Amino acid sequence: MISLYQILAEKKKKKKNDLNIFAFSVFAIICFKFYSVNAIKLPQQEVDALQQIATTLGSKFWKFDAENCKIEMVGLTETPPPTAKQEIECECSPTNDTDCHVVKFAFKDHNLPGTLPQIVKLPYLREIDLAYNYINGTLPREWASSNLTFISLLVNRLSGEIPKEFGNSSLTYLDLESNAFSGTIPQELGNLVHLKKLLLSSNKLTGTLPASLARLQNMTDFRINDLQLSGTIPSYIQNWKQLERLEMIASGLTGPIPSVISVLSNLVNLRISDIRGPVQPFPSLKNVTGLTKIILKNCNISGQIPTYLSHLKELETLDLSFNKLVGGIPSFAQAENLRFIILAGNMLEGDAPDELLRDGITVDLSYNNLKWQSPESRACRPNMNLNLNLFQSTSTKKSSKFLPCIKDFKCPRYSSCLHVNCGGSDMYVKEKKTKELYEGDGNVEGGAAKYFLKPDANWGFSSTGDFMDDNNFQNTRFTMFVPASNQSDLYKSARIAPVSLTYFHACLENGNYTINLDFAEIRFTNDENYNRLGRRLFDIYIQEKLVAKDFNIMDEAKGAQTPIIKPLTAYVTNHFLTIRLSWAGKGTTRIPTRGVYGPIISAISIVSDSKPCERPKTGMSPGAYIAIGIGAPCLIIFILGFLWICGCLPRCGRQRKDPYEEELPSGTFTLRQIKFATDDFNPTNKIGEGGFGAVFKGVLADGRVVAVKQLSSKSRQGNREFLNEIGAISCLQHPNLVKLHGFCVERAQLLLAYEYMENNSLSSALFSPKHKQIPMDWPTRFKICCGIAKGLAFLHEESPLKFVHRDIKATNILLDKDLTPKISDFGLARLDEEEKTHISTKVAGTIGYMAPEYALWGYLTFKADVYSFGVLVLEIVAGITNSNFMGAGDSVCLLEFANECVESGHLMQVVDERLRPEVDRKEAEAVIKVALVCSSASPTDRPLMSEVVAMLEGLYPVPESTPGVSRNAGDIRFKAFKDLRRGMENNSKTQCSVKSYPSSSSTSSGAGQAVQERKKEESRP
């Protein structure tokens, strides 16, 4: 048998640099089941049947090893994703281990384009899994007479009726979700008395639920979402005593929810939403104590929220949004596992209990009649709960109804237009004869309960709901970006929401407006695979008036990845305009993956019909507008600082009587103020060493806590770094960049005051001795990686002034109280002037993080930061520094060790052993691969940071193959470490780097010793 490695070797002889070798085949060693180590023997009939199945399914190449019951290769038109699965399982007779038969085959996530095969020649077959393919045709009636117990055809193109003959089968599992089956649900399915799971969501099924389904007393999972059924929810569901999961979302059935639901004591996951019918009381769930998810959205439920819900200790998600609930809100004090509580769109009154407003819970109280709310209320305290939505949550008629936590809000002026780049950055767009500025909100992370008001602009958005079942709690998934796209930049980004997304403007001129909503479906594709099978439907409301029902972007635009503009009108009477997009449960939810649904929008244009939109009158380019608007203040600060240093301007505060009270120019402090804040630079306030200077904690006279960086003005380098940092930080504003509060130049002192980070640096949090470390689970580390990537993407691609940081490392990543990463120490930042392809510069940075082309030749591009980011991500994943880690054998640093782990297929060895029991293996391996691609030896092999962000968020494929380690001694990435190691061996030293930082793992001669050292450190009190 010729192995794949032999094939690869032959290929490499022909073409060494062919990186797309996997496009022609996939190698899969498949698990098999038999009871002897001897070669098994399948009947030739079954071997031939498998070959015929391959042809019918549309596989272009198939090689089946009958002696070992495994598939060696399945030829495909493209490399399947990591989730692809191909499996043949055989069983042999206990008395004759050569008498074997095929009992299962699975080809999942392969985009096979054929039809369903005949299986009559596989009489022992029990399981078929063909989920996530592109199979068309009908469901063969002959399958009903087989021995099948398990059928999964999730996400395909199958159509026609469900054969009634399946009522005579032995099925225990039937998943037909996300196809195009039509007709009614056969009443014969009621004969499947052993059936445990029946999943029929997202089809074209009509009619009522057959009464015969009452006999399915072994049912544990029943899902009928996104259908066109009729009739009421049947009371016979009380017979399903074993039921654990019930989903009826936009099924077409009407209410009320039967009261007998209370007898389903095994229910864990209850989802009933978007049902029509009369007003109904809250369904009785008092006896269903094991519930973890309760979704009763838009069910026309009235009355009060039952207090017993707050005693459900296992409850994680409670969504009662868009009903008619009144009264107060229970405390939910005993619901210890509660993570999401969505009560939007009701008529709730009174206060929100303090127990509800606790950290770690996402709370949405928007669109209610609460009376407690005021700027002084607990919910309005700064940073009290970052996941709290209070939009239109009070009954008051004042502006605070729309803009909570703002006292005596008054519009400074009224606008006649607004242009928003939803989920993107600020950009100018040519419209007719002008260029309009579309303000971006891409820097604002979303959330299951998010309220955002843009400072000084009087517009914002409210987002409601969580993407269920995606097993992802990162708020970055509420925006989308497609870096590789032929569309205009306006349609490469978008903002999405699971349930409801409302954009508003609070200060518009009254009158008639023309509204253009820009859409593009950037999550689905037009390719001939299952990615084009997705359906996204949502409703559009203007001023809370329904203007479009079941809006489908792909239908309107005649395909995916195609822009479409929806023109609408509005009349503004109270200076307030709302545009709400709402998901009503229709459309697919599992294409291309779980949790893909809900409204999505690329841009919004609002223009008055009677008053002109104010805009710049000159004909300058967008770059000129941005450079003047942002570059000029930076240049002024830069020049002032330079003149101060040269002594051309008076020093700050020399003749001031009371520098603490007098008002200073924005952004400046006196030396006395800084000394007062830091207790005269008391060593006890010293919190670390930044680039070229010490850092002190300080408290200003107004109570603001700052971090003060003290640089030496005696050094020309200190002066230059000071000016660089002032210019860089003052120009850049982003959630993942440190914020500058001000500076001071006085008495040979160069001082910067920037926002104080409660958790110091990432280096301190990860690599300090055990008692000083901050415990970080995998989701936290993943969040930090994403945040750093977004900050760098902003520096490189989104900021009007582009910067290369040049010194990305753990000590230059600061962490706020929520462990949000902030890139700091801009002292080495270089402006990418005139978008040059590279800059030849004097090398500055840190050994171990510097890209080889920069360290050796001073060749500087954005890709140098990408390299440093890759190394940093490996450190975050491993919990060990690159330079202080010395792997087993010839590995001289963490980067080389990680590359070796990829080659050996043991990627999880890179992961911090403290995380391995809990880590999401696929996610961790993907992150490591991203890090290795970023740290490729050649800059051309490294991605852009925007592509890195998309990879981490699952919106862009992670390369399966990464540039490997060069086995000759000249690999430029590791040469410095090898030379250093030889020098240390000659001098009997123990450190691994010229410049290193405190680490929890002392350097040793092998990977095992490094880990042992960390264990020793952690065992100390």
From Swiss-Prot:
Glycosylation site positions: 96, 136, 147, 168, 218, 287, 300, 486, 512
Every Protein kinase domain range: 681-956
Binding site for ATP: 687-695, 709
Residues spanning the membrane: 626-646
GO molecular function: ATP binding; protein serine kinase activity; protein serine/threonine kinase activity
Basic and acidic residues: bias regions: 1012-1021
Residue windows of the LRR repeats: 99-122, 123-146, 148-168, 169-192, 193-216, 218-240, 241-266, 288-312, 313-336, 338-359, 361-381
PROSITE patterns: PROTEIN_KINASE_ATP (PS00107), PROTEIN_KINASE_DOM (PS50011), PROTEIN_KINASE_ST (PS00108)
Principal location class: membrane
Phosphoprotein keyword on record: yes
Pfam families assigned to the protein according to its UniProt record, in alphabetical order: LRR_1, Malectin, PK_Tyr_Ser-Thr
Keyword annotations: ATP-binding, Glycoprotein, Kinase, Leucine-rich repeat, Membrane, Nucleotide-binding, Phosphoprotein, Receptor, Repeat, Serine/threonine-protein kinase, Signal, Transferase, Transmembrane, Transmembrane helix
SUPFAM superfamilies attached to this UniProt entry: L domain-like, Protein kinase-like (PK-like)
Enzyme class: transferase
Signal sequence extent: 1-39
Membrane association type: Single-pass type I membrane protein
Localization terms from the record: Membrane
Tissue expr: Mostly expressed in flower buds, especially in stamens.
Entry keyword annotation includes Transport: no
Catalytic residues as annotated in Swiss-Prot or TrEMBL: 807 (proton acceptor)
Bias (Low complexity): 993-1005
Protein name: Probable LRR receptor-like serine/threonine-protein kinase RFK1
